[in-house]
A protein has these predicted regions:
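Hydrophobic helix-and-loop "lid/oligomerization" segment in the mid-to-C-terminal part
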Residues: 1-41, 45, 59-61, 78, ...
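Active-site cavity-forming subdomains of large catalytic enzyme subunits
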Residues: 31-99, 104-121
Length: 230
């Protein structure tokens, strides 16, 4: 979301209610997005085997890009693209990435392709510095309990440095509420910050965590973080 904001593109976020809709994409969820006239749907941490929902989007002329890391099967949905290091035909050797890591690598590739066609200069937009997102990527990496090897280790090492700068308003507010006064660590991500962000989904406020991480208003951040801290 923050990336699209930097590109001056409009976007919608949709977090399924896990009690009513389950964890993955659903036809009902996609219908809500399509009714809002979206042109493309990204699924994150899900979608590799969501045949029905993706077929529904295709029938409505909306492309779907899947950013996932869950195990796949030989047959895959008719999506525009399925970016998943655990596809049976994948040769990246990045099977250990979580969905946040997969999404980050997608943005790295997207940035590179946009740079090649001079998209940033043509649209008078500064190229996003993706390092600034590594606090969020490291949060996802730690909370998904994936091995801290290879690229994951590098992501978390750099991400903790970015987290220390408190550039993300939502994370900054959570750190203040958690009274994290030392240099942030893996423990802080996994046991203090992460559980609070996930808490919204367990109490019927499934969008609170995402809204907090996308929010740039201090007062709104404090309200959301306080509710997640209860």
């Amino acid at each position: 979301g923050n990336y699209f904001s930097e590109l001056n593109l409009e976007y919608e976020t949709y977090i399924p209610d896990r009690k009513k809709e389950g964890y993955g994409p659903s036809i009902d969820g996609f219908k809500k997005l399509i009714d809002k006239k979206v042109k493309i749907i990204f699924t994150v941490d899900c979608g590799t085997l969501s045949f029905d929902a993706i077929n529904y989007a295709k029938e409505n002329k909306v492309d779907v890009i899947v950013l996932d890391h869950h195990q796949s099967e030989i047959k895959l949905p008719n999506a525009f693209s399925i970016v998943n290091p655990n596809r049976l035909d994948d040769k990246s050797n990045l099977q250990y990435l979580c969905a946040a890591g997969v999404s980050f690598m997608f943005l790295v590739s997207l940035n590179r392709e946009l740079r090649k066609i001079n998209w940033f200069s043509k649209n008078n937009i500064n190229e996003p510095n993706l390092i600034n997102y590594l606090d969020l990527v490291s949060l996802g990496t730690i909370c998904d309990v994936v091995p801290l090897i290879g690229l994951n280790r590098a992501i978390v090492k750099q991400g903790l440095k970015v987290l220390k700068l408190k550039k993300n308003m939502g994370l900054k507010t959570l750190m203040d509420i958690c009274k994290i006064e030392t240099n942030p660590s893996i423990y802080h991500l996994g046991f203090l910050i992460g559980p609070r962000i996930n808490a919204g989904g367990r109490v019927g406020k499934c969008s609170h965590g995402a809204n907090l991480l996308l929010n740039k208003d201090p007062k709104n951040s404090f309200r959301l973080a306080s509710e997640l801290d209860q």
